Amino acid sequence: MKLPVQQVYSVYGGKDLPKGHSHSTMPFLSKLQFLTKIYLLDIHTQPFFI
């Protein structure tokens, strides 16, 4: 299951950053995106597995 990149970016206000540029220049933002993706994935999938 994949989440829209825009949705993940909009969570912490990184929507204005270029997609390819942000990963190479900001490792922290990339890690934050990874954690946010897991967090959102858990929220979206949790009700289905309860």
From Swiss-Prot:
Domain of life: Bacteria
Induction description: In stationary phase of anaerobic cultures.
Extra information: Overlaps sboA.
Protein name: Bacteriocin-like protein SboX
Source organism per UniProt: Bacillus subtilis (strain 168)
Gene of this entry: sboX
